[in-house]
Amino acid sequence: MSAQLINGKEVSQKRLQAVAEAVAQRQQNNLHHPCLAVVLVGGDPASAVYVRNKKTACQKCGIKSLSYELPESTSQEELLALVDRLNADSEVDGILVQLPLPKHLDSQAVLERISPDKDVDGFHPYNVGRLAVKMPLMRPCTPKGVMTLLEAYGIDPKGKKAVVVGASNIVGRPQALELLLARATVTVCHSATENLTDEVAGADILVVGVGIPNFVKGEWIKPGAVVIDVGINRLDDGSLCGDVEFETAKERAAMITPVPGGVGPMTIATLMENTLHAASLHDA
């Protein structure tokens, strides 16, 4: 048995098209033009690529994008002052500060400075808290993108055993909340988890985001499981791989996301959806 591939590129293109149509409809209705402000501090090459991809998605959707590229030497006060200006700007619907920030900056303080209704990354504690109490407002992009993928492929988490490997604030924790919201029975595994292989082997739905190449072995996976690999790692030979051992996993799983082309495109599509949602919040 070879698993069906979950095609994030295909699903993301449909979602981006839907956003583009909604943006065009807003313009016909004389509503203000959705606008995303993206802040990049320093010259990290990977971050520059991510920012460029986000700008390209904005162009596809007809969303206005503002770019702020600040030097590595930018102080905490200067960065917070920029966030304050963007918070106060009624033309700006979404604010995204690209992570990671240079080490001398306090990223948590910066994320908490963004107005929750403009927090299109969904990282503000207010938005994570809303998700926890079943009242989501701005949902973290990668976990929400995973849920969109599951829905697109007819996978209902209700009553299923879902296992999340990795407990980061960006993926693992909010992913567990999203799955809980969908009424799955959720287990979160982390660095202190004992018998990780047993936990993984019990998963009907497995989501892995630890940032370690091929961390989860194919033989651990329950036959017929759905495997969502959030990891993206560059190997010494320049190739990309996920956190799951793909070649062996696809022989046991029923469905699996490839890397690249699985979760990554969904993160950006969800960012566009969140920006559109933020614009609708600001219509009132």
Curated annotation (Swiss-Prot):
The UniProt record gives the binding positions of NADP(+) as G166, A167, S168, S191, I232
User: What SUPFAM superfamilies does this protein map onto?
Assistant: Aminoacid dehydrogenase-like, N-terminal domain, NAD(P)-binding Rossmann-fold domains
Please give the Gene Ontology molecular function terms for this protein.
Answer: methenyltetrahydrofolate cyclohydrolase activity; methylenetetrahydrofolate dehydrogenase (NADP+) activity
EC number(s): the record gives 1.5.1.5, 3.5.4.9
Q: Which GO terms describe its cellular component?
A: cytosol
Catalytic activities:
(6R)-5,10-methylene-5,6,7,8-tetrahydrofolate + NADP(+) = (6R)-5,10-methenyltetrahydrofolate + NADPH; (6R)-5,10-methenyltetrahydrofolate + H2O = (6R)-10-formyltetrahydrofolate + H(+)
The reply on keyword Lipoprotein is no
Q: What does this protein do?
A: Catalyzes the oxidation of 5,10-methylenetetrahydrofolate to 5,10-methenyltetrahydrofolate and then the hydrolysis of 5,10-methenyltetrahydrofolate to 10-formyltetrahydrofolate.
Q: What is this protein called?
A: Bifunctional protein FolD
Gene source species = Neisseria meningitidis serogroup B (strain ATCC BAA-335 / MC58)
Question: In the UniProt record, what gene is named as encoding this protein?
Answer: folD
